[in-house]
């Protein structure tokens, strides 16, 4: 008997949008829906190599700032490893995969935020070849509100410390991508948490 492939669901959003609580909610929904907990991934990260890259991009060496192009390439190196060694094998075995960020983050942050859209498209095509999530939930929030929330969690990492205009550009790119791709659903993350979660569950029930 041929194994039915699993589905790949991704949670996206700016810093402070509430991804962590959304991931817990979606995890429980998938487990109830399928009878099995999903394979959970994060980007960058999710494999031994990708976790080392995560540390590099989040905590650059003092005196050796990470240039935008190197940052972009590192994200895609981590993603390629994760897709090849974890995501695709899990889906092929029938497991569902729940991702904390995926390619849309690079499109928004490196493409929109850094102005490297041409490079992002080239590397994305080369490393992913059209592979994409079945459903992406983008938690939309004003960058100022999101960063205020993130700051309350503790010290901000290198990317969270970017100038505010960077996040405005990233947000605009997230929203533009959602307008052009029906598999990306925008969730208003500025609402009270219980309302955000109701919207997420309604979306999952409709889409899946």
Curated annotation (Swiss-Prot):
It catalyses: dTMP + ATP = dTDP + ADP. One of its GO terms (biological process) is dUDP biosynthetic process. ATP binds at residues 13-20. GO terms for cellular component: cytosol. Signal peptide: none annotated. The keyword ATP-binding applies. Disulfide bonds: none annotated. Its EC number is 2.7.4.9. InterPro entries: P-loop_NTPase, Thymidylate_kin-like_dom, Thymidylate_kin_CS, Thymidylate_kinase. GO terms for molecular function: ATP binding; dTMP kinase activity. Pfam families: Thymidylate_kin. The keyword Kinase applies. Keywords: ATP-binding, Kinase, Nucleotide biosynthesis, Nucleotide-binding, Transferase. Phosphorylation of dTMP to form dTDP in both de novo and salvage pathways of dTTP synthesis. Belongs to the thymidylate kinase family. HAMAP family: Thymidylate_kinase (MF_00165). This is Thymidylate kinase. The gene is tmk.
């Amino acid at each position: 008997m041929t194994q039915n492939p699993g589905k790949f669901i991704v949670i996206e959003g700016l810093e402070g949008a509430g991804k962590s609580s959304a991931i817990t909610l979606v995890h429980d929904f998938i487990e109830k829906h399928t009878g099995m907990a999903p394979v959970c991934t994060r980007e960058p990260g999710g494999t031994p190599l990708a976790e080392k890259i995560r540390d590099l991009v989040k905590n650059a060496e003092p005196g050796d700032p990470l240039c935008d192009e190197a940052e972009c390439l590192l994200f895609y190196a981590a993603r390629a490893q994760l897709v090849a060694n974890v995501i695709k094998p899990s889906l092929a075995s029938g497991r569902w995969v729940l991702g904390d960020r995926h390619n849309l983050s690079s499109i928004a942050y490196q493409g929109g935020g850094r102005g490297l859209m041409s490079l992002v498209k080239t590397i994305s095509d080369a490393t992913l070849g059209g592979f994409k999530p079945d459903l992406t939930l983008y938690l939309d929030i004003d960058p100022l509100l999101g960063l205020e929330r993130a700051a309350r969690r503790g010290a901000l990492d290198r990317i969270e410390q970017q100038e505010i205009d960077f996040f405005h550009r990233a947000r605009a790119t997230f929203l533009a991508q959602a307008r052009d791709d029906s598999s990306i659903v925008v969730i208003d993350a500025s609402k009270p948490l219980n309302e955000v979660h109701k919207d997420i569950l309604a979306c999952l029930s409709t889409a899946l």
